[in-house]
Each structure stands twice: as C-alpha cells, then as structure tokens.
Amino acid sequence: MTRDGQKFDLDEELLEKLYAKYAKGGLRVSGWRQWAYFVTKKSLWVSVVASTRALKRVMDIAGSAVGLVLLSPVFIITALLIKIEDGGPIFYGQDRVGKWGKIFRMYKFRSMVVNADKMKDTLLDQNESGGVMFKMKRDPRITRVGRVIRKLSIDELPQLLNVLKGDMSLVGPRPPVPREVAEYELSDRRRLDMVPGLTCLWQVSGRSDIDFEGQVRLDVQYLESQSLKGDIILLLKTIPAVLSGRGAY
C-alpha cells in the first residue's frame, strides 16, 4: 500500500490482536477489512459514550435545578442557624480537583469554626483515615449546627450549584483537595478521569468508614461500569444512606 507516495506495511500482528478482541461470530477477514471492522466498532463505541455523557449532563442540569428549588427552605433554615450560632460566614469555599486535574471552587455550608484550616495543622497526628485524606470522628473544629448538617449531608447541598455550572455531576467520585492529589500514586489518578460528583459508590457503602484504598477501588469500579441506569440507582441508594447517617462525620 502507499500513502503520500511512500510505501508502508500494515502491522499484521496488531490487526490480529484487534480482530481477536473485537470480532465476533468466528468471521475471518484480513488486512484492511479487519482494520475497517475495528474502526467501525470503535466509532460506534465513541458515539454511544458521547450520547451517554450528553444525557448525563441533561440529567445533571435538570436534577440540580429541581433540587435547588425544592430544597430552598432547607437552604434558608440552615443559613439562619449557621449565622445565629457564631455570626460567621454561611458558606465555605474550597479549591478542589476536577476532571483531568482542573481546579474549581467547591461550596459547602460551613460546618466548622471559622479558623478550621489553621487548626487542622495541629491535628494531623490524630488523623483516623488511611492514605492521603484527613478524617476525625470527633473533630473538635465542627460546630453544633455543623454536626447535624454533616450527619444528614445538608452541608453538601450548595454543590448543586457546582453541578448546575458543570464543575461537578450528580454522580461521580468525590472531588479531592490539591494537597491530597499531590500525594496520589499513579493508579490513584484514575479517579481524575471522571467529572466529580455529589454521590458515589463509597458514599452509599459506608462513606468515611471506608479507607482511602477502598474508595479508590470503588471509584475505579464506577469508572469502568458507569451508565445512566447505574447513576439513577446510586441516586436512589443515596437517600437511605444519608438518612442512616452511617459513616458521616
């Protein structure tokens, strides 16, 4: 065969591997027919993935918009309670790492004292989470209102704005902070191949009771098997998981 006036040969070994992986029914073809079959199969797969992502984004926009409207009374009551308790800011913004390492600003209802970030450095030796995350079951930085809204995951509701904006999805791995990502092993970085979400597999399977390695394993499992049906099932499982309060601290 020729291309641009130069002779080249097909990599027959590569074609055989591609054929073995993608061909069905025992049909034996060779050369360009194998290559054409593979390209067609790959193109169809890309089209399905693109369509699924588009539908997922539509679901994110609709779900976050409806959620913001229906939960507006909860927003108002929570904001008032936070303000009354210590007079500090209602919301807490923090840089998080999204898909492919993109940094974005994620929002929560403030559940800790105003100087919580500075206090964290003095508590690092009491970290109860394995891996690169920081978790304490009895974190002294959490306020009285904060304990309630964290138990019911109300503190996460402002992230519906992040979903509406497109920084996050309703379902996907929880977005890590840059300091955690800096300590990731290469295998851990697969979590960054997806848009982060409000809920995920480990959020409905024990939340903070699951160690870092377990969270990564479940996130990768979601990456390799994600579907709209699976997302809907995860959203439905999130409701009883939140109400139970298991692993929330």
Regions found by a protein language model. Give the residues of each.
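N-terminal hydrophobic signal-anchor/signal peptide
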Residues: M1-V69, Y249
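A short, structured surface patch at a secondary-structure boundary
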Residues: V132-V195, L234-V242
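Short glycine/proline-rich turn/loop motifs
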Residues: V39-V49, L124-S129, D139-I142
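Residue-level recognition of specific faces of alpha-helices
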Residues: L80, G93, K108, R141-R144, ...
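Short, glycine-rich, amphipathic interfacial segments at transmembrane boundaries or analogous
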Residues: Y92-P140, T199-R217
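A hydrophobic, helix-centered structural microdomain
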Residues: W45-M119, L228, I233-Y249
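Acyl-group handling in specialized metabolite and lipid biosynthesis
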Residues: V46, D219-L223
